[in-house]
Amino acid sequence: MLNEIKAKTKERMLKTIQSFHDDIKGVRTGRASASLLDGIVVNIYGGHQKLNQVAGVSVIDNKTLSIKVWDISVVGEVKNAILNANLNLNPVVEGSTIRIALPDLTQETREKLVKLLHQFAENARIAIRNIRRDIMEETEKMKENKEISEDDFHGAKKEIQNITDDNIKKIDGELSIKEKDILNH
């Protein structure tokens, strides 16, 4: 029973960590990265397609991305999707290829990005603490229903707190690395 509680806690918190990781992966660091365009959705063929489903994205150098659109008839829509993503990017079309020269980040932009990172991190921490609260309430009910003993309850409580602390440390560690990356490039 306790192993199930522990596994459930870890699984739910892992999903939160992965979501946080995906959020910060899309934040620019001053270096070209294909993941910068991961969240872009293109309106084509009467529906929505992720950019990586209609084009190949590659890094040419530290400041340049190349997007090879597989269907030349949708190059304009891909360009518009990039422009509408509010990433402060200026795509240039060259046939079926779109090149993006990444502008240097100003200090003001860097500070805004760091604020955004902190917001993502705080949202992830809140989600982790909410998961802890939910699991603790579940465990409390199990104790009240005599499904687990008092000792098991206290052991589970301690274990859940340790898992929570570990996951918050992971969030803070990833935040610190990404923050340094933004401020030092």
Swiss-Prot record:
* The keyword Cytoplasm appears for this protein: yes
Cite the InterPro entries for this sequence. Answer: Ribosome_recyc_fac, Ribosome_recyc_fac_dom, RRF_sf
Any idea which UniProt keywords this protein has? Cytoplasm, Protein biosynthesis
Q: Does the keyword Magnesium apply?
A: no
**Which domain of life, per UniProt?**
Bacteria
Gene3D superfamilies in UniProt: 3.30.1360.40, Ribosome-recycling factor
Can you say where in the cell this protein is located?
A: Cytoplasm
Say what the protein does: Responsible for the release of ribosomes from messenger RNA at the termination of protein biosynthesis. May increase the efficiency of translation by recycling ribosomes from one round of translation to another.
Q: Which family does it belong to?
A: Belongs to the RRF family.
Q: What name is this protein filed under?
A: Ribosome-recycling factor
